[in-house]
Amino acid sequence: MTRREFAMLMATALPAWGLTAPKRARAAEPIPVTLYKNPQCSCCESYAQYLDQNGFKVDVKATNDLAEISRKAGIPEHLEGCHTSFIGGYVVDGHVPVKTIRKMLDEKPAIVGITLPGMPPGSPGMGGEKTGSLIVYAVSRDGAVASIFDVD
């Protein structure tokens, strides 16, 4: 390779590489999460670890007012999960799989958030075997409408 060819290669390759650098840096930054849970709940700790292992930075806050936090966040009582998280301007209630959270964050729907009601066996952070599909609901801003957001 001649000096001129090398110079041309560097003149085109380096700027192109530089354009991708910010994307690489952003991908490595963990997504902040605030997770509220009952002080005695160990599955919530397991779920927080699951999020930490999948690109999130979780701040766990123990509270005895979890139902009130969920209600104020717009989650209907019959759709409440085991814990309530706040991620990227949305509420995520229960043991929602990471792929579903990422889907919501990528699509940016006009909703309050998503919820996986109860404590389904085999869901992220829960023990046991998965006994059926995990149905994650989208909760509208007025809380009146809940529709299926994703099924895992």
Show the residue positions of the predicted features.
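Thiol-based oxidoreductase modules, predominantly thioredoxin-like and allied folds used
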Residues: 58-69, 78-79, 87
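Short active-site oxyanion
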Residues: 32-33, 56-58, 88-91
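C-terminal segment of N-terminal export signals and the immediately downstream linker at the start
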Residues: 21-38
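Iron-sulfur (Fe-S) cluster-binding segments and ferredoxin-like electron-carrier domains
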Residues: 49-56, 60
